[in-house]
């Protein structure tokens, strides 16, 4: 509210790891009363086969290892370390835990259980969701459908669970190949369009690109305002249903 926003209409939004962070908030009883919509782009707390959360014991083990690398024994000592040292030791920790050493922790309070269990129990925030992927997220190898990839599978799985709770979910796929590149619709490529910042991109954007960006900005802002992306749009974006399923394509 101090910045002119509406505290009674809060949308959390994230992309990739940011989407995972946003998603986990929708499972916390401390956060859900303050959240009214969620936008999750190319990421989900359940997007990989291994659980993306730690038990308290696992988190303590990682913390102990980090203390060891830093040569300290308490959080107070960590806080006194130079930022450069923290970055160096964090990079070193990543080599020991390549599948992300820093994760949400199931502590029974902030996060009462794992997201997969809470999803099955209907324990997600009962709000509208907008979520999707890019066509070439994570560069799925040729011959394998990107629809088999973790991001897409997680989005559809979560959408199905939400529908059982009568929660609207709007799924999308960003299929637009960016100009000036043969990398297709790669991971993060949609961000120039959803934020309407094409003029800050070095690529030779065309009128077609600007029109697509305008369409996406309209949908995203409409969803933020009212939990429905269909205000002032040319084509209706239908919510997901288990029976037929609808995924809007941005191409």
Indicate where each model-derived feature is located.
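Non-transmembrane alpha-helical segments in soluble domains
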Residues: 23, 63-67, 75-79, 87, ...
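Serine-hydrolase catalytic core
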Residues: 89-90, 101-140, 146-174, 179, ...
């Amino acid at each position: 509210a101090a910045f002119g926003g509406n505290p009674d209409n809060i949308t959390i939004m994230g992309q990739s790891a940011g989407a995972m962070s946003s998603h986990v908030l929708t499972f916390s009883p401390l956060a859900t009363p303050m959240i009214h919509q969620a936008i999750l782009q190319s990421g989900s707390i359940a997007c990989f086969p291994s659980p993306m959360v730690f038990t308290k014991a696992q988190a303590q083990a990682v913390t102990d290892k980090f203390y060891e690398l830093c040569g300290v024994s308490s959080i107070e000592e960590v806080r006194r370390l130079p930022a450069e040292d923290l970055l160096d030791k964090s990079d070193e920790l990543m080599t020991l835990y390549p599948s992300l050493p820093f994760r949400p922790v199931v502590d029974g309070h902030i996060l009462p259980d794992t997201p997969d269990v809470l999803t099955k129990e209907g324990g997600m925030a009962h709000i509208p969701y907008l979520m999707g992927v890019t066509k070439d997220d994570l560069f799925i190898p040729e011959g394998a459908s990107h629809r088999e990839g973790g991001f897409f599978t997680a989005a559809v799985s979560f959408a199905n669970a939400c529908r059982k709770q009568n929660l609207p979910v709007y799924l999308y796929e960003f299929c637009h190949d960016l100009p000036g590149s043969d990398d297709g619709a790669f991971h993060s490529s949609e961000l120039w369009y959803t934020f309407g910042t094409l003029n800050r991109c070095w690529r030779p954007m065309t009128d077609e690109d600007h029109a697509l960006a305008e369409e996406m900005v309209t949908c995203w802002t409409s969803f933020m305002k009212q939990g429905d992306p269909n205000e002032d749009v040319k084509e209706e974006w239908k919510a997901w249903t288990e029976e037929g399923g609808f995924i809007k394509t941005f191409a």
